[in-house]
């Protein structure tokens, strides 16, 4: 939500608290009966924020309208990714510029979840990221990339970044953290 609703300064702590409360509420049905049809979508958060009856909650809900009912509603659906497959491929090429950063963060989060699950089962996870320099262009995805790159190896992950644009890759402020944690 910070990326969508936070603006240039991000969300305030009380706004994060409102979102946290709403998210806990919308997951009640899913936790009671964890089937795919009960998995909340972005519209459920939007509706919970409107029910909250608070000016800040209403402001956050208003910032979600484009992503819930508007032209950017790509993520207002249940996933079609089978997370049980041995091999998963995410393609965010067709996302517009406005959603690309969000898409990259969602993919990175899904990969991290897989690494975490596989660690418990003592299985190595190979992660190949093509056009890796694109993750390093945006501050939020660059910082997250360094964070997961450092943690991957401890958790049985084998990250591999691929790029044809080495110049952009090396220009990133975050590159030292990645190269320092690479073989």
Short names for language-model regions:
Residues 1-157, 161, 170-173:
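P-loop NTPase motor domains
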Residues 174-183:
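A short helix-turn-beta junction within AAA+ P-loop NTPase domains corresponding to the substrate/partner-engaging
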Residues 166-170, 178:
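Conserved H-loop
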């Amino acid at each position: 939500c910070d990326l969508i609703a936070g603006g240039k300064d991000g969300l305030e702590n009380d706004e994060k608290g409102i979102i946290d409360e709403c998210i806990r509420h919308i997951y009640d049905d899913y936790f009671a009966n964890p089937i795919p049809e009960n998995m909340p979508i972005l519209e459920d958060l939007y509706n919970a924020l409107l029910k909250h009856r608070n000016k800040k909650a209403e402001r956050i809900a208003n910032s979600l309208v484009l992503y819930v009912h508007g032209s950017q509603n790509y993520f207002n659906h249940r996933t079609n990714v089978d997370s049980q497959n041995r091999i998963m491929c995410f393609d965010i090429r067709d996302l517009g510029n406005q959603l690309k950063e969000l898409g990259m963060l969602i993919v990175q989060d899904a990969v991290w979840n897989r690494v975490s699950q596989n660690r418990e089962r003592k299985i190595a996870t190979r992660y190949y990221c093509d056009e890796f320099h694109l993750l390093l262009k945006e501050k939020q995805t660059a910082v997250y990339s360094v964070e997961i790159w450092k943690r991957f190896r401890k958790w049985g992950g084998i990250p591999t970044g691929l790029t044809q644009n080495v110049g952009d890759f090396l220009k990133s402020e975050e590159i030292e953290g990645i190269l320092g944690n690479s073989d």
